[in-house]
């Protein structure tokens, strides 16, 4: 019997309209909301989560834009997804979440679909981490519900995931 999970990656204000938002990310919001509202799968979501010390971290030194500081409006889920706030979620201070990957294994999911932002950073990192922890789980990414930092980096990430046996839904 199939046990399905929809993983919504980092659909937070700072990635859509805030510090790191871009037109590509804003453009997929309606697709993401539609997918969330019509899925028959369980739903989990991730929150990129940093503290005030973000500028002193390795990521902060390489990407010196404060974002997703816990407790700020930028850290929160976008308003269109507030209705899933009570779902299981994972705060992560890095691109991928090993806790999410372990949880998927413990819950016995057989299929995991990822949607969200950014394709070329956190979506690919979580897809690959989940794949490493759960090699027999069917993993897919809905390209129309993801966006990258740039259109080219989005495409490159999708191609990389496809090469690692992650199904890409165009």
How would you name each of these model-derived features?
Residues 1-89, 149, 155, 159-163, ...:
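Active-site acidic carboxylates
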Residues 32-38, 124-134:
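Histidine-anchored nucleotide/phosphate-binding helix
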Residues 41, 110, 137:
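Short acidic/polar active-site loop segments enriched in Thr and Asp
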Residues 48, 95, 144-146:
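Active-site beta-loop-alpha junctions enriched in small/polar residues
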Residues 71-121:
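Internal catalytic-core helix/loop-beta-alpha segment
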Residues 109, 135, 166:
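Short phosphate-binding/catalytic loops that engage adenosine nucleotides
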Residues 113-117, 137-149:
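A short glycine-rich beta-strand->turn/loop micro-motif centered on a GG-aromatic cluster
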Residues 121-124, 148-151:
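Short active-site-adjacent structural elements
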């Amino acid at each position: 019997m199939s046990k399905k999970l929809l993983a919504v990656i980092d659909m937070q204000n700072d990635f859509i309209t805030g510090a790191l938002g871009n037109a590509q990310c804003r453009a997929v919001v309606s697709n993401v909301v539609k997918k969330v509202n019509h899925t028959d799968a369980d739903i989990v979501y991730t929150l990129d989560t940093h503290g005030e010390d973000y500028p002193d971290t390795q990521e902060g030194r390489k990407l010196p834009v404060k974002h997703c500081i816990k407790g700020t409006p930028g850290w929160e889920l976008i308003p269109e997804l507030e209705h899933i706030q009570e779902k299981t979620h994972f705060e992560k201070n890095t691109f991928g979440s090993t806790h999410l990957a372990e949880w998927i294994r413990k819950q016995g999911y057989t299929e995991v679909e990822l949607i969200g932002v950014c394709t070329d950073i956190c979506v690919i990192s979580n897809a690959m981490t989940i794949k490493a922890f759960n090699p027999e789980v069917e993993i897919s990414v809905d390209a129309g519900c993801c966006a990258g930092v740039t259109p080219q980096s989005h495409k490159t990430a999708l191609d990389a995931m496809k090469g690692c046996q992650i199904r890409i839904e165009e």
